[in-house]
Amino acid sequence: MIPYHLMLFSCAFAGKNPFGPRLSIAEFASKFLLSNQEVVANKQKRFTAYLKKAADGTLLHRPDVNVPYVAHMTYHKPMWGVLQSSYADVEKELEVMREQHKDKRILFVGGDGLSIIRMNHLLLQRPERYIDSTPLIIPVQGEAPHGVFHVMHGGWRLYSRFIRAAADATLGIELAKAVVDEPTVKVFNTQIYALWWMTRACSEYLLLLSRTPGAPSIDQPAEFIAECEKNVDLAWVAHFLYDFAYLVLNFKQEVRANRSKHIDVLWREFFSVGNTGTANKTNYVPMAIMRIFWADALAPDLAHLYHNLRAIPMSKRVFVGWDTPIEWLNGAITDGVRQLVSDARIEEFVANYYLMNHSYASLLDVLEVLHGGNGTSHMKDMSSNVDEMKKWLVDKVGKDWATATVRNSSTKLGIKRGVLPWVEVRESMSQPGADSVPATICRHVRHLTKTFYAFR
């Protein structure tokens, strides 16, 4: 259910253009450059802010969110025999939804990466059906858990050598096997937990160094990072936070707070990570580009609605990604329909799910109040891992700024040889010709919008 104040728009009638003033393709492409001022400013501000949060023990606390309303969820009957594996399946799903909501002018349709890929191409192939007639289809990227996972996955691939060394040194070779080199969605929760304790440890280690003589201020992040690069091991620690871990944390927190335009800045930042050969996020890079297209190209009143609905107010405590409700439903079906499994039993379960889930959410509201409401009460204690990793960094890199910044190009952390992640990003983002950032952006966005949109 959408609050009335978000429904006052006039651009979504059949035959009426849902787009605003034409975008400049050059200006659009420039948003993804490594030097883009908005992206750089956010990274630098975030670095300082997150180190200060680490200092006061609030780094992993959920944002304090004012949720204006709680979404009312209606769960439709399951669509049997279709997935996202083919365009025909996704088109059938769209048609079922359009038929059930033919009195609507707009359908914002969420999904995981594969669903969004299919929808983007269906809009390209059949604009007369999905854009020029109602209900208009606007794809909404599922940003938590899927978006968070893929942002993490791209950076994890770049920093896997550091992660491996940190896990082995902190946990011991046998226990460290739980921290995998190539995470999948199935092990997302355990791997992001590992990322969080490494993030805390690296943050607290940099804070320790910053309080010793000669250290630059953390309020000057560019100078701070440049000094860290004198020692390759300290550079690994600093860039792990600056380019990767803080991006993942920032992304997750912004979805929780429904800060839509800030999420767009983070997708633009992700481009530099996902576009590298090591990260190889060949599906999520084009999807990130299209996410920004929809955020920028819509008519102002429709864009206002789009940004307000970026994340779903699932409870009084927090917003979630558009992919979260269906993930919860899938998990509930798996747990709740264990015996005599049949189509009829699953349909009955889905029909009753809203009441069960609403009751569960109400219980969580109570528990959140009892535990103080910062979200960390649900997380396994990580203090021993954090302390052990900090000890490793102190022993191998140095206990003060002067020691840690002695020029050194040979790792003492046991990190395997290879191109440094931050160097690979710079090289990837400075390619000439057809592989340049502007050419890549233009190629993707023009191809996927050529039947219904024209850039300046």
Range-by-range predicted roles:
Residues 1-456:
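Buried hydrophobic core signal strongest for RNase H-like alpha/beta domains in large
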